[in-house]
Amino acid sequence: MIKTFNINLAGQIFNINEDAYEHLSGYFNSLRTFYANEDDKDEIIRDIEARFAELFLAKGKNYIVTKEDTTEVVNMMGNPQEFDEENA
């Protein structure tokens, strides 16, 4: 049996399994760390959350988000470590 959670992402409720939740939570924690010194960090995080929500909604309403889904979206959006490489 796999644990699932209901999460609120950009005002949308999603059913997400435990592995996906941990992956997504880690990703957003790394974003918060990366943007910690930015004046508009909260807005940046909200925009990224909104994009994740859009991509998850495209998969359907009665859908459980899996780690494969979060990995796919993270790969599309990029990791904060990659942001540094792009700005170098």
Identify what each model region corresponds to.
Residues 1-88:
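Soluble N-terminal domains of membrane-associated systems
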